[in-house]
Amino acid sequence: MMIPSVIAPPAIYSAFMRPAASLHSPFPAHPSFLVEDLLRINRPSGFLSQTAHSPCASPPNSTPLSIPDNCRILDRVSPGITEKHGPCSPKTPVSSKDPTYLKFGVSAILAPSPKKATSPPSVHSIHPKGFSVPYFDGSFCPFVRSSYFPAPSSVVPIPGTFSWPLAARGKPRRGMLRRAVFSDVQRKALEKMFQKQKYISKPDRKKLAAKLGLKDSQVKIWFQNRRMKWRNSKERELLSSGGCREQTLPTKTNPHPDLSDVGKKSSEDEDEDDACAPSHFCLSPRRVMSNSTDSSITFKHSDFSESEDEITVS
């Protein structure tokens, strides 16, 4: 079954598709696709004769209907152009009583709506010196607007829009550890272990921490601080006796440095000196070794000085 309304065009559009046979148009019968030529099909012949003698008629030398036709087309298509260059015909409000008025025509669509009292001025009619507000609208690009320009809406300035400089960089800093307070019993036990070995092993450190009720990190930090304190005292003693601090640190040439306390060394030397004081021939093995080394050093130094003298003389 075929639907007749779909196949056959309705009778309403027949006038738009072909002109009526009884219509005698004064215009030349050449094919044209202008809006005016399409709209004048439904106009009566009396209206066409009236429009032929409009005030915008051209001089006698030219065709009398070409210019008004173009003027009407410009009035219907772009009213702003005719207002700028001057109207070709007196401006009359379009009303629904006009027989040629079409509700959905080009003039009705392009005409300004009656609800808007004032139409926005075009960009061409604005003088460049009359800008009192920024030219760019907020909807154009919100990042172009600066905080120095007045804005009708609350726009956040550009420096505050970026949050990445305020983000935390890297890992968060760990808080400062509280200083551990050791009791006298804990301090004595730690000092006793330090006198046995300056560098405590990890298993012994864990055992000592469990025995004293401390954390492994607390025992580790205590030994580090105690070794630094001991090295400082050892350095002062070595510097006073002509040594250097590197003697207390393990190196390739000296992987096992002398880690005995300087105070104990000095006390042992004093005890040996006091014990050997009554006899003139009593010498401690350490003193004998030191004397032999001193004599060998002086002998070598004298030989070196003599060789230098010989070299300089020759």
From Swiss-Prot:
Known DNA-binding region: 175-234
Q: What is its main location?
A: nucleus
Q: Which UniProt keywords apply?
A: Developmental protein, DNA-binding, Homeobox, Nucleus
Please give the InterPro entries that the UniProt record associates with this protein: H2.0_Homeobox_NeuralPatt (IPR051662), HD (IPR001356), HD_metazoa (IPR020479), Homeobox_CS (IPR017970), Homeodomain-like_sf (IPR009057), HTH_motif (IPR000047)
Q: Which Pfam families match?
A: Homeodomain
State if Methyltransferase is listed as a keyword: no
Q: Where is the composition biased (Basic and acidic residues)?
A: 258-267
Cellular localization per UniProt: Nucleus
- The source's domain of life comes to Eukaryota
Q: Give positions of region: Disordered.
A: 234-279, 292-314
Biological processes annotated in GO: cell differentiation in spinal cord; regulation of transcription by RNA polymerase II
> One MF term from GO for this chain?
DNA binding
Q: Where is the composition biased (Acidic residues)?
A: 305-314
CC per GO annotation: nucleus
Q: Which PANTHER family match?
A: DBX (PTHR24331), HOMEOBOX PROTEIN DBX1 (PTHR24331:SF6)
Could you say which protein family the record assigns here? Answer: Belongs to the H2.0 homeobox family.
Q: What is this protein called?
A: Homeobox protein DBX1-A
Q: What species is given as this protein's source?
A: Danio rerio (Zebrafish)
- What's the gene? dbx1a
